[in-house]
From Swiss-Prot:
Residues 1109-1170 form the SH3 domain. The myosin motor domain displays actin-stimulated ATPase activity and generates a mechanochemical force. The tail domain participates in molecular interactions that specify the role of the motor domain. It is composed of several tail homology (TH) domains, namely a putative phospholipid-binding myosin tail domain (also named TH1), an Ala- and Pro-rich domain (TH2), followed by an SH3 domain and a C-terminal acidic domain (TH3). Residues 1064-1092, 1180-1194 have a biased composition (Low complexity). Type-I myosin implicated in the organization of the actin cytoskeleton. Required for proper actin cytoskeleton polarization. At the cell cortex, assembles in patch-like structures together with proteins from the actin-polymerizing machinery and promotes actin assembly. Functions as actin nucleation-promoting factor (NPF) for the Arp2/3 complex. The keyword Nucleus does not apply. This is Myosin-1. The gene is MYO1.
């Protein structure tokens, strides 16, 4: 994982500030963002009224925004145009988002259903309601589009199921939709599509339930409407084979497609849609033989409609053109004479006392013959449509039981025409049932649940349409359907008599306030408005049965496909009344209610803005009427006063137990109390205010959706954090293994005398490169110094160095990488040194900046210096660490940089560019910007209080260093194993123990204390405890860590996110490393028992001199203004306390009253003489004697450490740790 650090103030000045360096983005004018019009959720209206709702919908419609919420209910206004809001890009933007993160959209409803199905293992459904032409079918198609895209699974079978589900749309639209006066693609049947999913939330099947096809449309339509789409598609785009075989003509040639005077529609391309229909048939799996039979029967229906009648001499019906029934007989594969007889005659049977009587053949008049002809066409099409639905289900059937389902209801909308008959009663009855479900689940059930759960609640009045549903479907008292069935049973032979009987029976339902009788018409006051129905022909439509003569004719067909459409054998002796159309629609509606009630519903309420299908017209009066009958105002009020989410205690705990450490551990449920108490515990531990929830008797109620989304987000992040924790542990383990292997390899090379030969050669080439022209630092000359090059591990393939390379997009091999500093100019102020990372590859030298942006570490490539542009590298002749890579030309000028490994950088630069010149002199000349030359002079001084160089106003003060002709010391050799002076070896470190710092770590020693870096105060080194009495001069081997490593620790702490577990663990890790341990006795484990008793311990040393005050007082010589959050501003003459002194020129100071603390430049301070007197020394104790002995031993070891180092790499490191801080006056 990436290493992060605390965010500090923005770095001041600089020629190229890193993008996103602040937590707050720069304010910009969002010209491309679409302006919000109105409110996106009607619950946010300042005034709740039907007029205010209508006005808000109008504003959004005119702005091209068609979707609005009422809580979780979506309001959709039909735009009658393509708004471009259903593209793949828009769809992708809604994946994984809750409804508050994105604008209202049908995709958001689909995402919510799919997420709830996966998360709560509950079946989902969406109920789309509204009047005809409001956009219900389009909404259902878009939900299917989203679910097919968002659902998981990439196997061929799952993808095939998705494609087949989408293919049901064009197929069922062709056979079940038609052009009406109000809608060019009106659904003339109801469809409930259930998409079935497995346990992985992948679609594995589907099932379609069909409701009440309007088969009367096959034989007649009102003016300017059309038959079902498939007839026009087939008549216009049939293949030549079908035209010659089935006698297909243009739609104008058929009575059933041309009588209404509309065969073409603007915006509908019948030829192109016929191709889509054929493609859908092929995709679903209809064979060519099945398609041929299907189109053969469609041709038969068209030709049946062309059979016309004339009166014979007896006034009965006779066929006008005999060739038409002959061709119909050819298509139906029956005898032509049988066809003529079936449509012109009827077999009547008399009975006496329950016994069969005489059989008569009764001739039909023209009206009766036309009715029989139309019944034949309607029966064939109705059964053909049912076969298509069943065949689609057969292809979509899941191979195994589905775990969960998502249901999509697309059903005809509420209809009010000038002339309304039985079809409109059935359609409006189904819409009443859907409205009843909506009221039951969103209004009544919700308020009843509040009362049952004892939740504080103010009841809200609403209209319950159950009284209207009872008016239509009830048996006692009898409703309209019951009266219809009684009329059909009483006067079944004469349709006119049956209609009269029905008028008389309607007097029994006249008591209902929502019913009015008007002569041969009646009015039902529906929730959507008053509708007047015509009684004429209503009982005949309710019978919904084919004459037995027709059934016998069809079952004698030589076409097995046609026979299979009418599988029930004709029982001529059965006297029982078959189910009527009202019985079927009532049963279907109740089954639909049962299915929908078993799932968690979502709602889409569609609104039709005008009756002219205009994309710009908004009929306020018509929309206001829809707002009223849809009950949107009551819905808004209940939503504002209610709760967004409710769940039983058990299911809530099962879902969110991970949010509390008291209820779960490692994903297991550990709570021992009740589910009620566990729910309270989870809500408290998650930080949910008590005002955001109420506890019922069996359920918890969450008031706002924001609270629920917050709980869900915290639950998702729990899994993310657990995965990150496992990844960190694994990476720590791999890093530890690698480090152990490296230590073993290094030790083995050391024993064989091969340790760092290549690095030593590089180091020695550095001496030759300088050529005695530059003073050296002490640490540059020690025997253990190696030129490693890639100190950050950029070539390792993992770790922080690899992370840097990926962030700046560099893949080349790295020759040199190290941390350093950059001298950054500031307008009107002194320049400042800012920490940077330097990376050298074969082609470029990179200056990389790291900053905190929105609590995330942001790495940017600040400067790229091409190696080919570098003319020479400039350095001073003193022991400082400044250098400059001078370029032939650069728009940003040359950069003055500081790096402790500048000699090694020069060597590596010579490797990648052999001809580069290394210029060493008393000053560094460079170009601050293009055409502006500058120089920095270097002066040696012995009065500098800091141990590093100091830059000020173009001049650098440098302490004296080693002579220029100095070379590295020899690598120390290990002692013999039996040496008395050797330190006892320590046991190997465990996996979590601290690791020995590498030489590259010293490069971090200076930069973290500079202005602009965001590090905490540098921890003080702890005093070593006294050694054990039996230890023999081993105090130096067990002392504290070297100063360079102590300087390194604040940098690591500043890069680690303090909120993460990793940061805390890293801090503990370094503290554990700093804590010195007492030396262990060497007698029992490593040497035999002495022959004589051990000599008594030496007498305790005299008390040490009084220590200096813990926090000496200093006075400020100049004003200093802080440049970072970790710095302290001081005024000239102000006195401060110094708690930590660092070698790099920065001291940790705090106000005299302790109110503020921060880093301040040491050069600005002067110690105040005669500070507070030190407290008297404590009386010597045994512990004090041990401490004195330990100090004496440490001083003795200091004298010996320059002569002999410990055996092996471990002893060498121990020897380094034994040096007091006063000797660490130099870095590498």
């Amino acid at each position: 994982m990436a290493v992060t650090k605390r965010a500090g103030r923005r770095a001041q000045g600089g020629t190229q500030p890193a993008k996103g360096a602040q937590g707050v983005k720069k304010a910009t004018f969002e010209s491309g963002k679409k302006r919000e019009v109105g409110v996106s959720d009607l619950t946010l209206l300042s005034k709740v009224s039907e007029e205010a709702i209508n006005e808000n919908l109008k504003k959004r419609f005119e702005n091209g925004t068609i979707y609005t919420y009422i809580g979780h209910v979506l309001i959709s206004v039909n735009p009658f145009r393509d708004l471009g809001i259903y593209t793949d890009a828009v769809l992708e933007s809604y994946k994984g988002k809750n409804r508050l993160e994105v604008p209202p959209h049908v995709f958001s409803i689909a995402e919510s259903m799919y997420y709830n199905m996966k998360s709560y293992s509950e079946n989902q459904c969406v109920i789309i309601s509204g009047e005809s032409g409001a956009g219900k079918t389009e909404a259902s198609k878009r939900i299917m589009q989203y679910i097919a895209s968002a659902s998981g699974g990439s196997s061929s079978n799952i993808q095939k199921i998705k494609d087949m589900v989408l293919a049901t749309n064009p197929l069922l639209e062709a056979f079940g939709c038609a052009k009406t006066l109000r809608n060019d693609n009106s659904s003339r049947h109801g469809k409930y599509l259930e998409i079935q999913f497995n346990n992985q939330a992948e679609p594995v099947g589907a099932n379609i339930t069909n409701y009440l096809l309007e088969k009367g449309r096959v034989v007649g339509q009102i003016r300017n409407e059309r038959n079902f789409h498939i007839f026009y598609q087939f008549a216009k785009a049939a293949s030549e084979n079908y035209r010659s075989t089935f006698g297909i003509q243009p739609p104008e040639a058929y009575t059933y497609t041309s009588a209404s005077g509309c065969t073409s529609v603007n915006g509908i391309n019948d030829e192109a849609e016929f191709k889509e229909t054929l493609a859908a048939m092929n995709l679903i799996g209809l064979t060519q033989a099945e398609q041929d039979n299907l189109f053969k029967l469609l041709a038969a229906i068209l030709w049946i409609g062309n059979m016309s009648f004339v009166e014979d001499k007896d006034g009965n019906a006779a066929i006008a053109d005999v060739s038409v029934p002959n061709f119909v007989a050819y298509l139906l594969e029956v005898d032509a004479e049988s066809v003529v007889k079936a449509v012109t005659q009827r077999i009547m049977e008399t009975s006496r006392g329950g016994r069969r009587g005489s059989v008569y053949e009764v001739a039909l008049n023209i009206a009766q013959a036309t009715s029989v002809r139309d019944a034949l066409a309607k029966g064939i099409y109705n059964n053909l449509f049912d076969w298509i639905v069943e065949r689609v289900n057969q292809s979509l059937r899941a191979p195994q039981d589905a775990a969960r389902t998502i249901g999509i209801l697309d059903i005809y909308g509420f209809e009010i025409f000038e002339s309304n008959s039985f079809e409109q009663i059935c359609i409006n009855y189904v819409n009443e049932k859907l409205q009843q479900i909506f009221i039951q689940l969103t209004l009544k059930t919700e308020q009843d649940e509040y009362v049952r759960e004892q939740i504080a609640w103010t009841p809200i009045n609403y209209f319950n349409n159950k009284i209207v549903c009872d008016l239509i479907e009830e048996k006692r008292p009898p409703g309209i359907f019951a009266a219809l069935n009684d009329a059909c049973a009483t006067a079944h032979a004469d349709p006119n008599a049956a209609d009269e009987n029905f008028i008389q029976r309607m007097s029994m339902v006249g008591q209902n306030p929502h019913f009015e009788q008007r002569q041969r018409k009646f009015v039902i006051k529906h929730y959507a408005g008053d509708v007047t129905y015509d009684v004429k022909g209503i009982t005949d439509k309710n019978k919904d049965q084919l004459l037995k003569d027709i059934l016998i004719l069809l079952q004698k067909s030589g076409n097995p496909f046609l026979v299979s459409l009418f599988p029930d054998p004709v029982n001529t002796d059965n006297r029982r009344r078959p189910p009527t159309a009202s019985d079927k629609i009532k049963k279907s509606a109740n089954d639909l209610v049962t299915t929908l009630s078993a799932a968690q519903p979502s709602y889409i309420r569609t609104i039709k803005p005008n009756q002219n299908r205009s994309p710009t017209e908004y009929d306020e009066k018509a929309v206001l009427h829809q707002v009223k009958y849809l009950g949107l105002q009551e819905n808004v009020r209940i939503r504002r006063a209610g709760f967004a989410y409710r769940q039983t205690f058990e299911k809530f705990v099962e879902r969110f137990m991970l949010l509390s450490g008291k209820t779960s551990y490692a994903g297991d449920y550990i709570w021992q109390g009740s589910a009620y108490d566990a729910t309270l515990c989870i809500l408290r531990d998650a930080g949910i205010p008590q005002t955001e929830y109420q506890m019922g008797t069996t359920k918890v109620f969450i008031k706002t959706p924001e609270t629920l989304f917050a709980l869900e987000h915290m639950r998702d992040m729990w899994w993310h954090n657990m995965a990150a924790r496992i990844q960190r542990a694994w990476r720590r383990y791999l890093a530890y293994k690698t480090e152990c292997a490296i230590k073993i390899q290094r030790f083995w090379r050391l024993k064989r005398g091969l340790d760092g030969l290549k690095e030593i050669q590089f180091r020695d080439s550095g001496h030759k490169l300088l050529g005695g022209r530059k003073e050296r630092r002490t640490y540059s000359l020690i025997g253990y110094r190696r030129f490693q090059g890639d100190y950050l591990g950029c070539n390792n393939g993992s770790g922080f160095g690899d992370f840097l390379m990926k962030q700046i997009g560099v893949t080349d091999k790295v020759f040199f990488s190290c941390r350093g500093q950059l001298q950054q100019s500031r307008l009107g102020r002194s320049s400042v040194r800012v920490p940077r990372t330097f990376i050298l590859t074969k082609n470029n030298f990179y200056v990389v900046a790291q900053q905190i942006h929105q609590k995330q570490l942001v790495v940017t490539n600040e400067y790229t210096i091409p190696v080919r542009n570098i003319t020479h590298m400039s350095m001073s002749n003193l022991r400082d660490d400044w250098f400059c890579l001078n370029q032939a030309s650069s728009p940003y000028g040359d950069q003055l940089m500081w790096c402790v490994f500048k000699t090694e950088l020069a060597v590596q630069l010579r490797v990648v560019k052999p001809g580069v010149d290394i210029r060493i002199g008393p000053q560094i000349d460079y170009f601050k910007k293009q055409g502006k030359k500058a120089s920095v002079k270097f002066q040696k001084t012995t009065t500098l209080q800091t141990k590093f160089d100091m830059y000020k106003s173009g001049s650098v003060q440098v302490p004296p260093g080693a002579p220029p002709n100095s070379v590295s010391k020899e690598t120390p050799r290990g002692r013999a194993k039996g040496s008395r002076g050797g330190a006892p070896s320590r046991p190997a470190a465990r996996g979590n123990a601290a690791h020995t710092p590498t030489p590259g770590a010293a490069a971090l020693g200076y930069q973290q204390h500079q202005p602009g870096s965001a590090q905490p105060a540098s921890p003080r080194a702890r005093k070593a405890p006294p050694p054990a009495p039996n230890s023999r001069g081993n105090g130096h081997a067990e002392s504290a860590q070297p100063q360079a490593y102590n300087n390194l620790q604040p940098h690591y702490q500043s890069l680690v996110n303090p909120r993460s577990g990793q940061g805390q663990q890293q801090q503990q890790h370094h503290q554990a490393y700093q804590q010195p341990t007492a030396a262990q006795p060497a007698a029992t484990s490593y040497s035999p028992a002495p022959a004589k008793a051990a000599p008594p311990p030496p007498p305790p040393a005299p008390p040490a001199a009084p220590a200096a005050p813990a926090e000496p007082t200093y006075k400020a010589l100049y004003d200093y203004v802080a440049n970072g959050l970790n710095q302290l501003s001081i005024s000239a003459g102000e006195q401060v306390l110094i708690s930590v002194k660092e070698d790099q020129g920065w001291w940790l100071a705090k106000r005299m009253d302790g109110s503020e603390e921060g880093w301040t430049p040491a050069a600005y301070l002067e110690e105040v003489q005669g500070g507070a007197a030190a407290p008297p020394p404590a009386a010597p104790t045994a512990g004090g004697a041990s401490a004195g002995a330990s100090l004496a031993e440490a001083l003795k070891q200091k004298q010996q450490s320059n002569q002999t180092l410990g055996a092996g790499i471990a002893d060498a490191i121990k020897a380094r740790t034994g040096r007091p801080a006063d000797d660490d006056d130099d870095d590498w």
